[in-house]
Structures are given as structure tokens and as C-alpha cells.
């Protein structure tokens, strides 16, 4: 401890030494609580001696080759060849041959699929679960007729369609511009 620039000895500490900046450093305080291992001084130093890194060495292990990776690597060149073949055919063919809206001609076999995609909310998923349970119960009871089960309609119409969030009230439909309104004018 210093008073007005003069060092004063304390009974519990050894005489302080000065580091390169002129600040007194007590070796006892720096090694306190270390049990002779260097104390806080070694913990604060970035380049302190490493603890035993030799005992905890990491090992590199070779991973087996994935069969999925093999399949992908054989598929990608086939896909590239097919794309190149299609580009060449498109360049040599008449303009309307590869039009997906033109289904006339040799490729007239077309399967049309109408798919609706919507997000179900929590109440919808509970109703689906209950309808699945009721359909399982009805399949177990052979005495009930299938006409009474309205949970699985055969055709979607305006009367039986269920739109998400339709419980909150009716939506507002506003026609801004239509061919019928143009004919009236």
C-alpha cells in the first residue's frame, strides 16, 4: 500500500514489487487461492501454459459412404443429360409442340388433377380427428348405413365446402371489375 508515493509495508503481504508500468504488484495476492498452481494470474493470461492438452486429443474418424449419396450422384448426370436432350428437342421442334396448354396431338392422354391447398387451424384439426374416430366407429358397426355419414362428402359444392376461418362471420365479397359489369355500361 502506498501513501503519497511512499510504499508502506503491511503485515499480511510481502513487500510489493513493481511491474513495467510502475504499479506495485503483490505476488501473494496474485497467487491467492491457487494452492500453488499460479492462481488468478495464470487464469487471466491469454498465453498461460496450457493445462494437459495431450491427454484430450481429438481423433478424426472416417464416416461410411451414404447409399443415398451414391443414388444422388448417379441421378444428377442422368437429369443433366435429359435436360440437354429436351433443350435440343425444343430448339428443333415447331414452336407449339412443347406448349403445356396445347394438349392436342400425339400427347393427348392427359390426367387433370384439381388440388386445393389450405392451412388448417386448431379447431379444424380437432374436427378432423373426431371425424376420423367417428368413421372408424362407423366402419366397426356394420348395421349403420354409409348415407348417414356426412363428414366425407362425395363432391365439394358451395353448400358443403368448409373454408378456413369461416367461423368468425361471413366474408365481404366485392366485385371490382368483371365482364358482366362492362356489358351493362
UniProtKB/Swiss-Prot annotation:
Molecular functions per Gene Ontology: box C/D methylation guide snoRNP complex binding
| GO CC field | nucleus
**Among its keywords, does the record have Cytoplasm?**
no
Bias class Low complexity marks the residues at 10-21
Q: In the record, which positions carry Phosphoserine? A: 34, 66, 178
Q: Which UniProt keywords apply?
A: Chaperone, Nucleus, Phosphoprotein
Q: Which superkingdom?
A: Eukaryota
- Region (Disordered): which ranges? 1-40, 118-185
Q: Name one GO biological process term.
A: box C/D snoRNP assembly
Its annotated compartments are: Nucleus
Bias type Acidic residues, positions: 143-152
Alphabetized InterPro entries for the sequence: NOPCHAP1
Residues making up the signal peptide according to the UniProt record: none
Q: Known Pfam families for this protein? A: NOPCHAP1
PANTHER family this protein is in? NOP PROTEIN CHAPERONE 1, SIMILAR TO DNA SEGMENT, CHR 10, WAYNE STATE UNIVERSITY 102,-EXPRESSED
Subunit structure of this entry? Answer: Interacts with NOP58, RUVBL1 and RUVBL2; the interactions are direct and NOPCHAP1 bridges the association of NOP58 with RUVBL1:RUVBL2 even in absence of snoRNAs. The interactions with RUVBL1 and RUVBL2 are disrupted upon ATP binding.
Biological role: Client-loading PAQosome/R2TP complex cofactor that selects NOP58 to promote box C/D small nucleolar ribonucleoprotein (snoRNP) assembly. Acts as a bridge between NOP58 and the R2TP complex via RUVBL1:RUVBL2.
Q: What is this protein called?
A: NOP protein chaperone 1
Q: Could you tell me which species this protein originates from? A: Homo sapiens (Human)
